[in-house]
Amino acid sequence: MTPLDAKRPLQLNHQGQLRHFLSLDGLPRELLTEILDTADSFLEVGARAVKKVPLLRGKTVCNVFFENSTRTRTTFELAAQRLSADVITLNVSTSSTSKGETLFDTLRNLEAMAADMFVVRHADSGAAHFIAEHVCPDVAIINGGDGRHAHPTQGMLDMLTIRRHKGGFENLSVAIVGDILHSRVARSNMLALQALGCPDIRVIGPKTLLPVGVEQYGVKVYTDLNEGLKDVDVVIMLRLQRERMTGGLLPSEGEFYRLFGLTTARLAAAKPDAIVMHPGPINRGVEIESAVADGAHSVILNQVTYGIAIRMAVLSMAMSGQNAQRQFEQENAQ
């Protein structure tokens, strides 16, 4: 457990309900299952003629993205809109932060505008924790990705994808392949799989892209792709995060693809009904072959659909938990 994750109780209210969603570390299996079950119930909303439910009517959700994102930002916007919330998306590149305003001041000003929830994506690990503890403790904070640390909603949408396509976790072998070192998605997935009872979690990559001590997540480590993929049920590919790399961690992208790129031939080592996942954006010909990304084993587009439902679940649960905590504190202050 990292110092950041030692603050896990910050995420829960006095009844153990979600009030912030910052990391998956330490969250009980029952709560993760509740998120998955709630998301399952929201999937049918997307199939309606009117894709809305009134759970967050009258509430304001602010998406504050200090890092670029298309998929995550758009699905959070859709999730909030389908819950009937008012949605504000802050373009940080054109905001006051580019004029020297601090993260603290930006969020406090938004809070003064009566925002009820912030979805925050930031390049610094721990940014969402800092905001939840020191800046806006009375506003529900959702971590949309912070540095290398965590991407909890991506982790949960991946778990929903696995559960819907494989039925559960108890008998599965799951391989996470690629740039594990720089991936907040990998960390969130390892934590979620462990909490949900997956017995065989594998990480596969070159030694230079594997974190020191990764075994603490209860995983088996492989540096040979063919060996690591043998008889797995699920393959989660990760992109090379060149923007976070320093030094000569890789000879070239071509060399990485030769050794660790997922091709049709390499996928044959997995089980015949294995599914292939990717959090996006995909680098075709770097970590995955187009024939695999677009093939029968791929559930990559399903992940996007499930992402909306997971984010609806998290937004609605965190808002409910924060409201309950606020009421509890008001009653006990009297």
Curated annotation (Swiss-Prot):
Broad EC category: transferase
Pathway listed: Pyrimidine metabolism; UMP biosynthesis via de novo pathway; (S)-dihydroorotate from bicarbonate: step 2/3
GO MF annotations in UniProt: amino acid binding; aspartate carbamoyltransferase activity
Reactions mediated catalytically: carbamoyl phosphate + L-aspartate = N-carbamoyl-L-aspartate + phosphate + H(+)
GO biological process, alphabetically ordered: 'de novo' pyrimidine nucleobase biosynthetic process; 'de novo' UMP biosynthetic process; amino acid metabolic process
Documented EC number(s): 2.1.3.2
GO cellular component: cytosol
Alphabetically ordered keywords of this record: Pyrimidine biosynthesis, Transferase
Residues that coordinate or bind carbamoyl phosphate: R71, T72, R121, H151, Q154, G280, P281
Domain of life assignment: Bacteria
Binding site for L-aspartate: K99, R184, R239
Cleavable signal peptide: none
Function in brief: Catalyzes the condensation of carbamoyl phosphate and aspartate to form carbamoyl aspartate and inorganic phosphate, the committed step in the de novo pyrimidine nucleotide biosynthesis pathway.
Membership in a protein family: Belongs to the aspartate/ornithine carbamoyltransferase superfamily. ATCase family.
Quaternary assembly: Heterododecamer (2C3:3R2) of six catalytic PyrB chains organized as two trimers (C3), and six regulatory PyrI chains organized as three dimers (R2).
Protein name per the record: Aspartate carbamoyltransferase catalytic subunit
Organism (species): Pseudomonas savastanoi pv. phaseolicola (strain 1448A / Race 6)
Lineage: Bacteria, Pseudomonadati, Pseudomonadota, Gammaproteobacteria, Pseudomonadales
